[in-house]
């Protein structure tokens, strides 16, 4: 008798009013599973010119040290050396947010990224007027005894 009252209190079970599932044809079920992907994650391959334009714009919009360092980290993470125009924008951004150490480290990043010392010297020659204008000293000039 107690089980009758429990059933009456709970109400009718959901199974009594459940709709009966209609069997689907096999063709309709097969479309849900596939061995080949319909959607591909094809990405546009960014050219060096697009990369340069994007990072120049990013560095021109920098408002604080965090943004500057994040953009530098992202720019140097690619398997290429940023162009002198990107580096010039980064140096100007470093001086704009008054971050002298990061400006010096930009040149350390260049030195680590280039393939040989000749390329590093070319970057230094290209950026020398801007470096002198902004008053940025190289690590080699700050610590001559550590120069390799």
Swiss-Prot record:
Domain of life: Eukaryota
Transit peptide residues according to the UniProt entry: 1-40
A GO term from the CC aspect: mitochondrial inner membrane
Gene3D superfamilies found in the cross-reference section: Cytochrome c oxidase, subunit Va/VI
Membrane-protein topology: Peripheral membrane protein
Primary location group: mitochondrion
Coiled coil segments of this chain: none
UniProt keywords, alphabetically: Heme, Iron, Membrane, Metal-binding, Mitochondrion, Mitochondrion inner membrane, Transit peptide
Subcellular location, record wording: Mitochondrion inner membrane
BP-aspect Gene Ontology terms: mitochondrial electron transport, cytochrome c to oxygen
Pathway(s) it belongs to: Energy metabolism; oxidative phosphorylation
GO molecular function, one term: metal ion binding
Oligomeric and partner information: Component of the cytochrome c oxidase (complex IV, CIV), a multisubunit enzyme composed of 11 subunits. The complex is composed of a catalytic core of 3 subunits Cox1, Cox2 and Cox3, encoded in the mitochondrial DNA, and 8 supernumerary subunits Cox4, Cox5a/Cox5, Cox6, Cox7, Cox8, Cox7a/Cox9, Cox6b/Cox12 and Cox6a/Cox13, which are encoded in the nuclear genome.
Known role: Component of the cytochrome c oxidase, the last enzyme in the mitochondrial electron transport chain which drives oxidative phosphorylation. The respiratory chain contains 3 multisubunit complexes succinate dehydrogenase (complex II, CII), ubiquinol-cytochrome c oxidoreductase (cytochrome b-c1 complex, complex III, CIII) and cytochrome c oxidase (complex IV, CIV), that cooperate to transfer electrons derived from NADH and succinate to molecular oxygen, creating an electrochemical gradient over the inner membrane that drives transmembrane transport and the ATP synthase.
PANTHER family associated with the record: CYTOCHROME C OXIDASE POLYPEPTIDE (PTHR14200), CYTOCHROME C OXIDASE SUBUNIT 5A, MITOCHONDRIAL (PTHR14200:SF11)
Family the UniProt entry places it in: Belongs to the cytochrome c oxidase subunit 5A family.
This protein's name: Cytochrome c oxidase subunit 6, mitochondrial
Source organism (scientific name): Neurospora crassa (strain ATCC 24698 / 74-OR23-1A / CBS 708.71 / DSM 1257 / FGSC 987)
Designated gene of the protein: cox-6
């Amino acid at each position: 008798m107690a089980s009758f009252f429990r059933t009456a209190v709970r109400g009718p079970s959901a199974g009594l009013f459940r709709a009966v599932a209609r069997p689907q044809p096999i063709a309709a079920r097969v479309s849900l599973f596939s061995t080949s992907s319909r959607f591909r994650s094809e990405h546009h391959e960014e050219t060096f010119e697009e990369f340069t334009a994007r990072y120049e714009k990013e560095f021109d919009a920098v408002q604080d040290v965090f943004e500057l360092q994040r953009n530098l980290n992202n720019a140097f993470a690619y398997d290429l050396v940023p162009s002198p125009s990107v580096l010039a924008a980064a140096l100007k951004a470093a001086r704009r947010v008054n971050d002298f150490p990061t400006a010096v480290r930009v040149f350390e990043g260049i030195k680590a990224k280039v393939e040989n010392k000749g390329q590093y010297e070319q970057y230094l020659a290209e950026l020398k007027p801007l470096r002198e204008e902004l008053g940025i000293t190289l690590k080699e000039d700050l610590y001559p005894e550590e120069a390799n």
